[in-house]
Amino acid sequence: MYRAENIRVTAGAKVILDDASLSLSAGKVIAIVGPNGAGKSTLLKVLAGERRYGHGTVTLDGTPLQHWDAAALARKRAVLPQSVVVAFPFFAGEIVALGLPQYFPRSEALRLVERALREVDMLSAREQSYETLSGGERQRIQLARVLVQLWANGGQGYLLLDEPTASLDLPHQIATLRIAREHANAGGGVLAVLHDINLALMAADELVAMRAGRVIAKGAPKEIVTGDLIHALYGVRAEIGAVPSGPFLLPQSIRG
């Protein structure tokens, strides 16, 4: 289990996270939602071990995160950031292969890279220059990279995804969340920062709702999502509809 408890992060006088807590267990998809500047990405980076914090604790499988060495941590969790800068010319397939451990058997490496490219619908771009890909295509290649990272180490572990659908068209948004669900169903855990509240409602077992650095609500979507919560998060009025699979958001008309 991944656990963050009472995390506080500051930058000078600004409080970025204020007593933020969440737990992520195997078999679950958790979505962090909230407005810009709420601290969503910072909390994910704290869990990833990529952001220092001034107060609180982060543990992975009961061990403080700072006690994990980099190689062991890479076998347990893979991180998809909002954007990745690639400074050298690579083919798309080579970017995916960067997720593999050093000295990984070549035949198995080729198999996993091909599998991951198929999973994200990018096999045809394997020999294409990464620089020539669109933003959404690059995002899918990076998703394939983190999938390979976990598959090479047993296939489970935790996916930490920071806005994985932001650059994608609707079919690939849905496909990305299907991949996340399948990873959880196979025994992994997924934490995703999502801006599209309806995608979050569709995909997540649990929502973590954040505003101004604080977690103001968390739980199953059916249990916590109300018009009042949406107003508290975003300052807008919305109706909450329901279908058998769960709630969905209907913003008020913008036509006046």
Residue ranges: model-predicted function:
Residues 33-35:
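The feature captures the beta-strand-to-loop junction immediately N-terminal to the Walker
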Residues 231-256:
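ABC ATPase nucleotide-binding domains
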Residues 56-64:
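Conserved ABC transporter NBD signature motif
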Residues 159-163:
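Catalytic Walker B motif of ABC-type/P-loop ATPase nucleotide-binding domains
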Residues 2, 16-19:
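Conserved structural motif at the start of ABC-family nucleotide-binding domains
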Residues 110-125, 147:
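Conserved ABC ATPase "signature" region
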Residues 48:
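Helix-to-loop junction immediately C-terminal to a conserved catalytic motif
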